[in-house]
Amino acid sequence: MPSARLQQQFIRLWQCCEGKSQETTLNELAALLSCSRRHMRTLLNTMQDRGWLTWEAEVGRGKRSRLTFLYTGLALQQQRAEDLLEQDRIDQLVQLVGDKATVRQMLVSHLGRSFRQGRHILRVLYYRPLRNLLPGSALRRSETHIARQIFSSLTRINEENGELEADIAHHWQQISPLHWRFFLRPGVHFHHGRELEMDDVIFSLKRINTLPLYSHIADIVSPTPWTLDIHLTQPDRWLPLLLGQVPAMILPREWETLSNFASHPIGTGPYAVIRNSTNQLKIQAFDDFFGYRALIDEVNVWVLPEIADEPAGGLMLKGPQGEEKEIESRLEEGCYYLLFDSRTHRGANQQVRDWVSYVLSPTNLVYFAEEQYQQLWFPAYGLLPRWHHARIIKSEKPAGLESLTLTFYQDHSEHRVIAGIMQQILASHQVTLEIKEISYDQWHEGEIESDIWLNSANFTLPLDFSLFAHLCEVPLLQHCIPIDWQADAARWRNGEMNLANWCQQLVASKAMVPLIHHWLIIQGQRSMRGLRMNTLGWFDFKSAWFAPPDP
C-alpha cells in the first residue's frame, strides 16, 4: 500500500479510537474503517512494521486483542502535512489539515527560498488563483505579469527602464510609414517541444486584429524565411512596442485544440506551466529557452484567499522568521479611480459628477480609512503620481439625488474597503449607495451599466506608450466615455497627442476621478539577488537568483 494511503488509514483509525489504546477485535476495527477483516489484519501488521502501533492478537471465540498506539495521529498528520508541503501538493494539504489558520501558518513558514536536489525553488504566497493566462483575453495585473514569464513576443520591453529590446525578432526596420519588417530567430521552441514556425507568428498576430490597438494591421506576410512583413492602414510609431505587449505574444497555432490552454498555456518563454489549480500555480524554467536560461529553477505561487483581507496582502515573499528581510517598495504608476457612466442619467449628469467627486475626494477617503490602509494609500490628483490635474471644488448636492449604483470587479478586497467608505460618506448626505460586484470579464466588456464604476489601473513603462494603450484597450471605458476613441488613437499613433493634456481633459470633465495611489511592497530575503519590483508589483523571475548555500 502506498505510504500516503497507509498514513491516512492510520490517522482515521487513531481518530475512531480517540487515540486510546484498548482491547478490541479485528471485526470491530474492520467495521470502523469499512473494510474486510482480512484487509484490516494486513493494515495492522503493516502499521506495526512502521512502528506506529502494536497489535497483540488473541485467538479464540470471545477473546479480545490488544491495540496500543505508539504514535499519535496528530504527529503523523503533521508529518504527512510536511511531506505534502515539500511536494507542493497544496490541494491535498488543505484536505488533510482542514483548519485554514494552520494551513496558512504552514505555508508562510515555507515561503521564500528552497534548495532541493541542486534546484533553486522560490515559493510565493498570493491571495487568489491565476487561472486565466491567455494572451488577448481580459487579464488582470498579476496574470499579465505571469503571461510575460510564459510567452515571448517579437519584441519585449525592459521592465526597469522601459526600453525596447529584441525577443523573437532580433532586428526590425520601418520600410515605409505603412510597412514594417521584422527578422526572426530560427530554432525557437515551444514548451511542448515543437519548433516555432512562421505560421505560428502570423496566426498569433492575425487573431488579435479585432482588438482596437491592432485593428490597423492590414496584412501580415513572410516574403522570405524568418522574415515578417506587417502592413498597416495608418502609420504607427508605437508598433514595435505594441508587438511586445501581452496580446501580441506568440501562441502555437493549434492552441485551441490543446486541453485547458487558458490555465495551462504553452509558450516559448523562460518558464513553462507545470500545474495550475485553485490552490497553486507552479512554473518551471524552460531548458530550451532561446534566451538566457532562468536561474530560479521553479516558482510556486501558493494561493491563500485569507490574506486578501490584509492591507499589505497580495504578494507575500518571506523566508523563515530569523532571516534578514529586504523590502522593495514603490508608489504605483496608476491609481484607483471613479469612472462615471455616461449611459445612465445620473452618471451623465455634470452636477452629480461634481458633487460626488467633491464628497468622495481622495483626502476624505483616506481620512475615513482605517490606519492600516492610511499607511498604504496616497491621495491621487492625477492618473499618475506626478500629475496634479484634479481640482477639488465645493459643490452642492443635486436636488432629488437619493441613490447611486457603484460597480466593481470581484476578488479585490480593497475595492470592498473603498466602496464601504464611499457608502458611509454618502449615507451621511442621505444618499444610498447600491454596490454591485461582477466578474472581471463582465467588468472588462462593459456591457452592464452603472452610475459609477470603481476601477484601478497600473501602467507599465514606458508610460507615454502604456497609459493610452491601457485605457484604449478596455471596452468599458469606451462605453462610458463618449469621445472619438478612433481619432484619438490615430493621433496617438502619429505622435501628435499631448498625453498629459488628454488625461487632464478626462479628469476635468469628471469622466474619470483619480482617488488613491497605492504603495506596492514586496518583502523578500537578502539572499535573493536581482529582485527589482516592476510597476505591476511583481518582479522578473528569470532575472532573480539566489546565492547558493555554503558548501
From Swiss-Prot:
The keyword Transcription applies. Transmembrane segments: none annotated. Residues 26-49 bind DNA. Residues 1-116 form the HTH marR-type domain. Residues 163-492 are annotated as: Solute-binding. GO terms for biological process: negative regulation of DNA-templated transcription; peptide transport; positive regulation of DNA-templated transcription. One of its GO terms (molecular function) is DNA binding. Keywords: Activator, DNA-binding, Repressor, Transcription, Transcription regulation. Activates the small RNA gene sgrS under glucose-phosphate stress conditions as well as yfdZ. Represses its own transcription under both stress and non-stress conditions. Might act as a sensor of the intracellular accumulation of phosphoglucose by binding these molecules in its C-terminal solute-binding domain. This is HTH-type transcriptional regulator SgrR. It comes from Escherichia coli O6:K15:H31 (strain 536 / UPEC).
